[in-house]
Amino acid sequence: MQAQLMVYGYNFVSELLEEKIVEQMNQYIKMDLPESYQVSKREMYADMLNGKITSMERISLLNDLSQNFGTILYTGSDPGMVPAAKAGGIVDYCQEMPQVFFRSKINLNITLRSIQSGIPLRALDIMGAGGFLMSNYQPELARQFEEGKELALYGSREELLDKTAYYLSHEKERQEIAHRGFLKVQKLFSYEMRVRKMLELANLEF
C-alpha cells in the first residue's frame, strides 16, 4: 500500500494480488456471494485495498495541507483525523455544495484509487460550479482539460504543496483558470452534449 501511495496515474494493486495472497485473504474475509456474481474475489479485494489506500492518502495529504494553509474539511466522517483543518460539516449536494466550490480558493479532488479510468464526477462538479480544481493526475482529465489553463494537476505530495502555495498567491491566474475550466465543462459536458455522445456511440441519430 505504501508503494501505491507514491504512484499517480497507474494502479498495480490488483496485479500484485497473486492467487496465494487471495487464498490467504479468503481465510479472514468471509463473503457469501451468489453464483451469478460476476466480480472475482481478486477484484473485490483490490477494491478493498484501494479504498484503504485512498483513505490513508486523503488523511495524509489533508494533514500536510492544513498544517501549511487554511483548510476547511467538509465531511460527515470524524474530522479529528485532520486536527489542523476547520470542520465544515456536511453540505447539501444540490444547494450548498456548488456555493462551496465557487467560493473556495482551491478545491481538492483526490480520486478513489479504484477509479482507474474516466473523469471523476467531483472534478466536473467543481469546475461546473466555477470553482478552481486541483486534482491528482488522471489520464482522462489530462486529455480533456489543459493543465495550468483549465485546472491544476499534481503527481506527487511535493507538487501538490508547491502548486497550492503558488495558486494561493496568484489570485488573478487562479480565477482565470477556474473560468476557463467552467467554460470547458459547459461546452463539453452539458446534458445535451452527453446525450449526443451516447447516441453517437450507439449509432443512433439525435
Task: Tell where the protein language model's regions lie, with residue ranges.
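Nucleotide-sugar donor-binding catalytic core of glycosyltransferases
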Residues: 1-115, 138-141
